Each structure stands twice: as structure tokens, then as C-alpha cells.
């Protein structure tokens, strides 16, 4: 059964938060009681994603395996490919008071991201994001709902003519979202603060082999389509051969406290954002575990507000946001929802799904 959406408002925020944290408390014996770092013991993590179930990405001990596509018959309802990524992280930078202006949480992989990848690709309940379909919306536990049409977040078949993009905010160093989800979109832009980008680029390049369904071009990563060796007297380029479609993948600095898309002069500072507008008909903004203290909430929501206005008015894009939260502080979660709904006037849906409710995470769809 597909997930449902609970439309939150200024009254149901508190009911939702109370219920979710009550569920969490009831599962305290089953769930890890930690801050959510995927693995704080190692500098290099080996993680496997495969369609055998939601296992959160099994960690390997520095044994590198390359991507191998499953022999299971292709099914657009769930992904069938397996992915194996190597993530270099920096525990020392996480605890540093000097690195990246003392904003250091992005130097390690947090568990929200692997959980989201597993759920999106392999959970049957996440099918609306893979197929593009109507989803039932309720306005509360006892309220009869309506249906909301969702565009595809990812296209497993490659047959959809629509051009879709993903803009990732607060990517951190791992780079696993672009190299996995990049297989199923046309444009992917991964952003974070400037001090994070070099390690993010390194991890993307390390795992570029996981882009098995796409040819990747990137200005920021200096990737161009290769030229095929001449055959006989003919010069044949890769672009002229029938093969994989192309992914535009970019890595860019985006400071939530400094972005100003209302000033047209600053648009030239963000060519990667313009790339999404110029190449896509729909965009999902993805932000995993970026709301963990109250000081980040306003800059994040202001950035979303600007992006929504600019991409919709300038390029007429379908605009949706997926926010993943590791449920730590109940006060921070409540404040985020209050500000998003009441102060910034976003439409916010809780994604109601059993797999998610049995975890320490929650996902919100924002429009």
C-alpha cells in the first residue's frame, strides 16, 4: 500500500508531533539511542544498497565491491539494481572548532540519508515518488481526505519524456544521493557550504561507477562526454551513439544566510540553479537531516521560499520539497513545523507510512 499524506495546519501540528514522539518512545527498546551518525568508528565506510529489504545500508569493513545490476526482471514499481558506495568521512573535522567556520556536521554521513535511499528505491509504499501518481491526503486522523497528484521524483524506466531535476540542500560530504538517484533524473545539483565541497566532490568521483544508467557531464567535476575511437574512416563520438541518456551533475556552494535570488545581479553567481530551470519541467528539493537545531530553521525556510518563487515564476517548474528529519528534539521539530506552516505559509504534509513510523526518522513533503 502506498504512503498517505497528512495535511498539517497550525492546529494539527501539535497532534502530529505528540503522536510521532509517542510512537518513538514506544519503540525505544528497538531503535538505536544515538545522535544518528552512520558509523563514527571509521574514516571510510562501505555501504550496500540492495532490493532485499530496508536494512539501512549494510556496512562493510573496507572491502570494495563494484556495482552489479540485479538479474531480476525490470519492474517500474521498485528498483532492482544494487549499489555499493565508499564514503570517506572525517571524524576529526566533526569535532573541530576550526574547520568550515565551526559548522562541521556535514563532515560525516548521517543515517537519515541511507534510510531514505532504501525507502525510496525499494519500499513498495514509496511507489508514488517512482511512478508519479495520486496520493490520498487526510486533514487529520478522523478527516476524510482528497487526492494529490505527485510528479515522479525518479524515473526507473527511462521512458518518461518529462525532464526532472533534484536540488539537494545541505548535502554533506557523502555524495551518495547524487551517484544513486542520479541514475533516474536528468539534472542533479548538490549543494552545501564552500568548506564541504572538496570532500563532497572526492566522494562523488570515488563512486561515479554507480551511475550505471547515465552518462555524466559536469562543469564543476570537469566531466565531459568521452570520444569513441575512430572506426574505419569515420569519427564517431559518444553523443552520436545510441546509448545511455545524459545526467547533468553539478556541485555548488549555497549559503542559506547569504542567498538572495530577488536580486537579479546575483543570479549569475548560481548558474547551477539556472541549469535546473533551463533543463527541467519539475524539481524536487531534497534536504536530509539539515534541521537539528533552532538556528538553522529560518535560513533554511527563507532559502526554500526564494527557490520556490524564483523557479516557479522564472521557469514555471513544478516545485516540491522533501525534508528528512532525524527525530531528536521534539521542540526543534515543533518549531520547524510552526515556522514552515504559520510564518512562511508553506503547505506541509506528513508522509504517513509504516516503515517510516517504525524508524527514528520522519519525512515531510512541502509545496
UniProtKB/Swiss-Prot annotation:
Chain residues that bind S-adenosyl-L-methionine: 110, 170-172, 192, 256, 288
Keywords carried by this UniProt record: Methyltransferase, S-adenosyl-L-methionine, Transferase
Compositionally biased residues, Basic residues: 58-68
EC id: 2.1.1.-
InterPro entries assigned to the protein according to its UniProt record, in alphabetical order: Methyltransf_16 (IPR019410), SAM-dependent_MTases_sf (IPR029063)
GO molecular function, one term: S-adenosylmethionine-dependent methyltransferase activity
A single Gene Ontology CC term: protein-containing complex
Region span, Disordered: 55-74
GO biological process, one term: methylation
Described purpose of this protein according to its UniProt entry: S-adenosyl-L-methionine-dependent protein-lysine N-methyltransferase that monomethylates 60S ribosomal protein L1 (RPL1A and RPL1B) at 'Lys-46'.
Record family assignment: Belongs to the class I-like SAM-binding methyltransferase superfamily. RKM5 family.
Protein name: Ribosomal lysine N-methyltransferase 5
Native source species: Saccharomyces cerevisiae (strain Lalvin EC1118 / Prise de mousse) (Baker's yeast)
Lineage: Eukaryota, Fungi, Dikarya, Ascomycota, Saccharomycotina
Amino acid at each position: 500500500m502506498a504512503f498517505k499524506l497528512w495535511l498539517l495546519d497550525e492546529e494539527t501540528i501539535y497532534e502530529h508531533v505528540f503522536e510521532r514522539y509517542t510512537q518513538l518512545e514506544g519503540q525505544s527498546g528497538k531503535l538505536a539511542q544515538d545522535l544518528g551518525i552512520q558509523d563514527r568508528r571509521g574514516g571510510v565506510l562501505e555501504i550496500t544498497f540492495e532490493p532485499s529489504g530496508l536494512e539501512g545500508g549494510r556496512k562493510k569493513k573496507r572491502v570494495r565491491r563494484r556495482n552489479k545490476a540485479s538479474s531480476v526482471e525490470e519492474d517500474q514499481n521498485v528498483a532492482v539494481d544494487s549499489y555499493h558506495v565508499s564514503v570517506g568521512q572525517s571524524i576529526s573535522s566533526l569535532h573541530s572548532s576550526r574547520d568550515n567556520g565551526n559548522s562541521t556536521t556535514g563532515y560525516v554521513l548521517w543515517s537519515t540519508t541511507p534510510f531514505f535511499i532504501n525507502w525510496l528505491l525499494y519500499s513498495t509504499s514509496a511507489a508514488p515518488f517512482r511512478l508519479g501518481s495520486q496520493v490520498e491526503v487526510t486533514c487529520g486522523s478522523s478527516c476524510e481526505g482528497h487526492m494529490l497528484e505527485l510528479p515522479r521524483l525518479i524515473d526507473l524506466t527511462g521512458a518518461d519524456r518529462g525532464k526532472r531535476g533534484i536540488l539537494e540542500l545541505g548535502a554533506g560530504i557523502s555524495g551518495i544521493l547524487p551517484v544513486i538517484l542520479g541514475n533516474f533524473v536528468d539534472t542533479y545539483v548538490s549543494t552545501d557550504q564552500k568548506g564541504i565541497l572538496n570532500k563532497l566532490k572526492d566522494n562523488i568521483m570515488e563512486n561515479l561507477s554507480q551511475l550505471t544508467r547515465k552518462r555524466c557531464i559536469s562543469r564543476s567535476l570537469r566531466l565531459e562526454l568521452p570520444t569513441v575511437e575512430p572506426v574505419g574512416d569515420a569519427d564517431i563520438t559518444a553523443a552520436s551513439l545510441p546509448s545511455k541518456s545524459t545526467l547533468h551533475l553539478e556541485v555548488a556552494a549555497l549559503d542559506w544566510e547569504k542567498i538572495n535570488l530577488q536580486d537579479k545581479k546575483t543570479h549569475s553567481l548560481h548558474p547551477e540553479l539556472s541549469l535546473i530551470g533551463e533543463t527541467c519541467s519539475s524539481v524536487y528539493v531534497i534536504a536530509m537531516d539539515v534541521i537539528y537545531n533552532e538556528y538553522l530553521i529560518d535560513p533554511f525556510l527563507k532559502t526554500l521560499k526564494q527557490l520556490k518563487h524564483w523557479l516557479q515564476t522564472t521557469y514555471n517548474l513544478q516545485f516540491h520539497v522533501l525534508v528528512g528529519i532525524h527525530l531528536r528534539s521534539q521542540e526543534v521539530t515543533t518549531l520547524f513545523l510552526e515556522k514552515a506552516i504559520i510564518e512562511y505559509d508553506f503547505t506541509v504534509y506528513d508522509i504517513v507510512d509504516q516503515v517510516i513510523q517504525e524508524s527514528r526518522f520522519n519525512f515531510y513533503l512541502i509545496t
